[in-house]
Each structure stands twice: as C-alpha cells, then as structure tokens.
C-alpha cells in the first residue's frame, strides 16, 4: 500500500513543481518589468549591469529556496504518515527540477513483470517475451503437423465426397445414376450362369409331389450342387 501512496505523493509533488515553475515565471517577469522601469529612469541609467543581474539571480534563488521549503515540508509529512523515507524522491534542484520522474522510471523498470516458461531448466526469471515463445511451443506440441498423404490416398480422399453428394432429393447421385443406366434389368442377372458352359439344370417340379410337399431327401437332391456345375431352379 505504501508503494501506491508513494505514487500519489509523487503526483502531488509534480503538481507542486508545476506551481513552483509557474510562480517562478511570474516572479521572473515581475523582476524583468522592474528592471525595465529601473533602466528607463534617466537618473538611474548609470547603475552597473552586474548589479541588476545579481538582483535577478537573488530573486530566482529566493523563489527556489521557498519552493524547496514547501517540498521538504511535504516530504516530512509523508515520512510521518507512512514511515517511509522519501528523501531520494523529493530532490529539488535550483527550484525547477524534481528527480522523482527519474527515480520513478527506474523503479518501474525494476518492477517489470517476469515469468518463467514451463519446462525451463533454471528457475531464473525470464522476460515476458519468453512466455510467448513458450506458448507457441506448447501450441505446436498440442497440434502437431499432419504428414502429407500419398497421391493414391489423396485421389481416393478427393473422390469420397462424390459418393455422398445428394441430388437435392436426399438420394445418392452416383447410386441414382447407376440405377438409371441399369434400367429394369435385374442385378442378379449378371450373376446368372453362362449357357455356353456345361451346366446342369435340376427342375424342381420333377421332385415336388402332387400335393406340393417335398421330402427331406428331395430337398437335399435339389439343393446339392456338383463342383463345376451350376444349378438353376425353376419355379413351379
């Protein structure tokens, strides 16, 4: 908490510095006007210039001393309230320069955030930029690059969406085209035995009794297939 209070006091001191600078400018203008009036008088034109410069310098030093007293009073009040010695912060030079800005910039550099990336061997703090590099490495580890596919697999992968493409009615386009080209042709006909080959047909009507019943032996004979011989059943 004292750190934040110190920053507030520094802000107050910066305001006091601006007021002191404004007062210094006003007093300088007043001194310049007085010197102008003093030089304009005929009876006092013989006054040496060194005397007037000493008078102006005395006025500036007096203003600086008064401003320094004010700042030292603020410093003492700050020490009484917080118990922190703020002497390096409240440094006044010739009534116009406060060193609080320089010290504040140094303290901000010392308080820069530091992080230690995951997987680091040493526990020494690393700059914040190293954390971004660690995040990139973790991202690449979680999402490794995929190996390129072979040309054959790539062609098959490209052809796969065509299989599932719909013609707008929820039907498979390739299947619909295939059935359209086939017409009313029974798909089982392409597996029918070739008549040019030596085939033996076993008509089922010869083994069916008059009452339509079939014995087990007849069923075995009807369904028995000789190797190399295709059997074609005919309906009753």
Swiss-Prot record:
The annotated region (Disordered) lies at 102-135, 165-209
Keyword Signal included in the entry's annotation: no
Transit peptide: which range? Answer: 1-73
Per the annotation, the residue ranges of the short sequence motif MAHS motif are 126-143
Give the primary localization class: mitochondrion
Write out the biased-composition intervals (Polar residues).
105-126, 192-202
Q: So which domain of life are we looking at? A: Eukaryota
Subcellular location(s) per record: Mitochondrion
Domain comment (free text): The MAHS motif is conserved in tardigrade MAHS proteins and forms a predicted amphipathic helix.
Say what the protein does.
Mitochondrial heat soluble protein acting as a molecular shield in water-deficient condition.
Q: Which protein, by its recorded name, is this?
A: Mitochondrial-abundant heat soluble protein
Organism (species)? Ramazzottius varieornatus (Water bear)
The beginning of the lineage is: Eukaryota, Metazoa, Ecdysozoa, Tardigrada, Eutardigrada
Give the gene that encodes this protein: MAHS
């Amino acid at each position: 908490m004292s750190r934040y209070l110190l920053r507030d006091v520094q802000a107050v001191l910066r305001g006091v510095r601006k007021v002191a600078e404004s007062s210094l400018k006003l007093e300088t203008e007043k001194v310049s006007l007085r010197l102008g009036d003093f030089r304009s008088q005929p009876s006092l034109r013989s006054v040496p210039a060194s005397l007037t410069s000493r008078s102006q310098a005395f006025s500036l030093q007096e203003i600086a001393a008064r401003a320094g007293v004010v700042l030292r009073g603020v410093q003492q009040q700050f020490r009484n309230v917080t118990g922190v010695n703020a002497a390096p912060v409240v440094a006044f030079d010739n009534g116009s320069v406060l060193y609080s800005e320089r010290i504040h910039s140094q303290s901000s550099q010392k308080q820069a955030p530091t992080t230690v990336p995951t997987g680091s061997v040493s526990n020494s703090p690393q700059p914040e930029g190293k954390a971004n590099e660690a995040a990139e490495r973790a991202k690449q580890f979680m999402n490794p690059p995929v190996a390129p596919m072979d040309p054959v697999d790539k062609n098959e992968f490209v052809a796969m969406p065509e299989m599932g493409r719909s013609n707008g009615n929820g039907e498979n386009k390739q299947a619909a085209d295939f059935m359209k080209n086939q017409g009313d042709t029974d798909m089982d006909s392409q597996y029918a035995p070739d008549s040019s080959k030596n085939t033996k047909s076993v008509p089922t009507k010869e083994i069916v009794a008059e009452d339509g019943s079939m014995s087990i032996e007849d069923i075995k004979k009807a369904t028995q297939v000789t190797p190399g011989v295709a059997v074609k059943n005919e309906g009753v």
